[in-house]
Amino acid sequence: SAYYFGSGGLNIPMVNYNQVNFGNPATYSYLLRHKPIFSVGYKAKMIQLNTATDNQNTNYLGLSDFVMGLPIGKKGGAAFGIMPFSTVGYNMADPSYDSHAGNHTYNYAGNGGVNKVFIGASRKLINRSFLAKTDSTKMKHESSLSIGTNAYYLFGTYSNTRGVDFEDFTYLDTRSEINTQVSD
């Protein structure tokens, strides 16, 4: 989620009653009772690529997560959702010259991606509250222990293409495409 993305992705030790922390499934049991959480996150990227002779700008806007968190009773919680696991998206051309083949261009392209579906559950094993007295103040302390687990399923397709285009028609252009389907 954007909440954890804003902390540099350091979400494992964080507990928040109003956010689903899919990086640490033990936190699902801390969701507030009677308040299911639904979250949709988007991610935007602006990338500028530069070489000595060329530059290219590219933009990306896509789903970062689609998550539902459900408190279960006083001590339990569950969550499920979908998010990108990896994305592929590039298109490059590298012009070249060879004394035998003349001018030609190496082309590289890739697109697609793999998504991750998860489901998880958590349960509080220990939940204690106590008052600690100091000289003039009383403070409420909580100590708890929870366990949790997530199960994941990866799916998606991506392709990588490479080829050479020759300006001289005596040479044949070549193209190779590799398509990969993930369902594990």
Feature annotation, model-predicted:
Residues 1-184:
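Subset of outer-membrane beta-barrel
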